[in-house]
Amino acid sequence: MAELTPMMKQYLEIKKDNPDSILFFRLGDFYEMFADDAKLASKELDLTLTSRDHGKNAKPEEERVPMCGIPYHASESYIARLIAKGYKVAICEQMEDPATAKGLVKRDIIRVVTPGTVIDAACLDDKSGNYLCGIYLDSQGGGAAFCDLSTGETHLTAFSGKDTLTHIINELGRFSPAEAILSDGAFSEKALTDVLTDKFHCRYENGGERRFRLAEAEKNIRAQFGEEAFSRLPAGEPAAAMALGGLLNYLYETQKTDLSHIRELDYYRQGRFMELDLAARRNLELTETLRSKEKKGSLLWVLDKTKTPMGGRMLRSWLERPLLSVTDIDRRSSAVAALVDDTIRREELIAGMTGLGDMERLIGRIVYGTAGGRDLTSLRAAMEKLPNLKEQLSGFSDRRLTELTAELDTLDDISGDIAAAICNEPPFSVREGGIIRDGFNEEVDRLRHILKSGKGVMAEMEAKEKEKTGIRTLKIGYNKVFGYYIEVSNAFKEQVPETYIRKQTLVNGERFITQELKDLEHEILTASERVVALEYELFSALRQQIADNAGRIQKTAAAVAECDALCSFASVAVHNNFCRPEVDESGVIEIREGRHPVVEKVLKDSLFVPNDTFMGEKEERVAIITGPNMAGKSTYMRQVALIVLMAQMGSFVPAKYAHIGVVDRIFTRIGASDDLSAGQSTFMVEMTEVSDILHQATKNSLLILDEIGRGTSTFDGMAIARAVLEYCADKKTLGAKTLFATHYHELTEMENTLPGTVNYNIAVKRRGEDIIFLRKIIPGDADRSYGIEVAKLAGLPEKVVQRAKVILKELEDENGVQYVAARKETDQVSLDAMSEGEVLDAIRRCQPDTLTPIEAMGLLYELKQKLNK
């Protein structure tokens, strides 16, 4: 086998230290990939796969090394595609100039790009954070840390007790991490790794105990965030520090650069924000719809009218983390109210923020050392909008807006420095020159002058030498052998100064050089390289100067982001006729003419019908809601939940009036979202979710329960539904505010026996044999289920519908309700091997009021099949 070339030996040594990454190996103007990396990259990136000899004196029959490559200046888009597919990419750069290197060019890894450590704009969503997560779990509790490397934003929380894993999974829902580093304890929890894979499509790896050592974690936290931030962590509860320590260790190992923009640590404990489990986030469609997984049609789609990327990210974070403190809620909603009341100034603020660049991510790239000239001009353009924003904000008397005015630094000095140094339209690359503005640096100007007018410079020197020596025939020439020279005819050679050095004797004269001429020649011939190097040096110095002010810029960016998010809330409130809710700790939820914020936006052919809601601390704590499917029960219940959530975000709400007593959690059990991919039955999924809700809810929670017990037999389902309802309503067991939709009409009797329970139903208007859903919630229970009418609306064949009406009439004539009340579970309907008489008996035993529309349709279909036989 042929001996490996020095370059291939170097490649294999570097690859050995990065076995889990695709290695981008810099060779000249390309990043090359070899062997298995080349095969994988060529497939994923649609690159042509070639090959090369792997050693010296390789024989033709010896196997060649697979190889593919990409231009280094176009690498961002290729890296983005690999990261989107979950790969890690190790960037190996040339650490010295190949032109001056002695022997093999030194190369090393400058960073490893992973899904959770991306900073390039091509890989990121402007209005979503990109979080790396560190999770530590042991028998005592656990911690979770989240960091968006592109902005430096860092959050940390910890839990203890038996529900730690559940709480941490709920925290994952707030941040939707792109990548997770797990301790041994966390890595062994299948429930956690399944959620990371199935729900978040998140790359994860076992960080091992090495990355999560407590002493090293505490040292790194102190160094990164400062002593004051470290002191806020809970003493005696190391899980938080170890989670953050594992995350920091991973960053240090993969990034190999300055991370000083990661400086502010947000440590929060349970009880600061409303906790939402994954089911509630999914069912309430907070950031994406259930079906299409798109933003359009979600609550975020309605609320997000922000004008800046950082404002969009902040508004999303408010949606993911509704507040529990009445003081904090009031502070935010007061700012929104002030903006609502001052239309002119609000619109001027919005106009001023339109098109303002992503200052948070720009300063992240600047500190990171990857920002180019265009990033600096974008930052300058954003900064130039700040004085006007500050002036507009200063006109408000609201406390929070006044604080934002003070926090907003106009950064005139930094924008001025950028304007002075960087040209208006800098090139893409910072290493090719043309980035520094004319007039900023004398040496750059001189070298550019030499480049642009080399002949002119020599002509100037020729004129100067003629004048100095008095030799009229003196001239400066150039050839490839001697370079530039001074030629003097024989008639004047006696006048040549002693400083002239003879280089060549001619028939008619002599050729000389001077030190000044040689220096000028060197400048002309090397001016291009020197001006490019000097421009990069000046640019790097300016970039570092800006990086040194990262704290100022981040604070201002946060102020702009908050102003943008508040203006979005105000604009949405004005354009959608929202009201400011009263928020307190009364335990009361009172809503007058409430509307679903999303449904009312997507309705095209009809107006949304508003509804009232009252849920007290003692009376009307539990609402049993009956009525046919398609009538609006689920929409109404989601509407109440969303209004409560919006109020606790500090937003105005879609209602004429709203009084919201703070709830600590919102739970939802809505069957339409059943995910059966794990192989569990619908009923098992339902019971698991209900179990989680009953174990985690408190008396201050809001429960949305839709069709509990629908996935099993009639009596089983009714028994479970009643038991759940009693558990929720009874203050001795739970006593939580509950909206409980059901098709089990027998449960409506509980209004008379279960304190705090009240019946509501969806109003229906009959017109001949047709029905019209009025979408209005009214007191009392539904008089019937309207299952056949729903089947007709769904398009069931008319013959089946008419037959169903006949069967229903027969059952009603036989007073089926009394019969059902007395029957036992052993009387379940069986359709196997029935005669016509047995089919009729089955119909007689059936109670349509206890069937959902889908169950009724299924029963009709099977009965018809048996009769046909």
Residue spans for each PLM region:
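Conserved catalytic alpha/beta cores of large enzymes that bind or transform nucleotide phosphates
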Residues: 172, 177-185, 191, 206, ...
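Short, amphipathic C-terminal "tail helix"
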Residues: 372-375, 848-869
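Active-site phosphate-binding and catalytic loops of NTP-dependent enzymes
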Residues: 92, 115-124, 258, 394-400, ...
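Amphipathic heptad-repeat alpha-helical coiled-coil/stalk segments that mediate oligomerization
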Residues: 141, 212-222, 274-278, 286, ...
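Intracellular alpha-helical coupling/juxtamembrane segments of multi-pass membrane proteins
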Residues: 329-332, 352, 356, 454, ...
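Charged catalytic and DNA/RNA-contacting regions of genome-maintenance
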Residues: 1-338, 354, 358-367, 371-460
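Extended active-site and interfacial segments that coordinate phosphate-rich ligands
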Residues: 38-54, 147-175, 494-525, 605-615, ...
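ATPase nucleotide-binding head domains, primarily ABC-like/P-loop NTPase cores
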Residues: 35-38, 237, 307-308, 318, ...
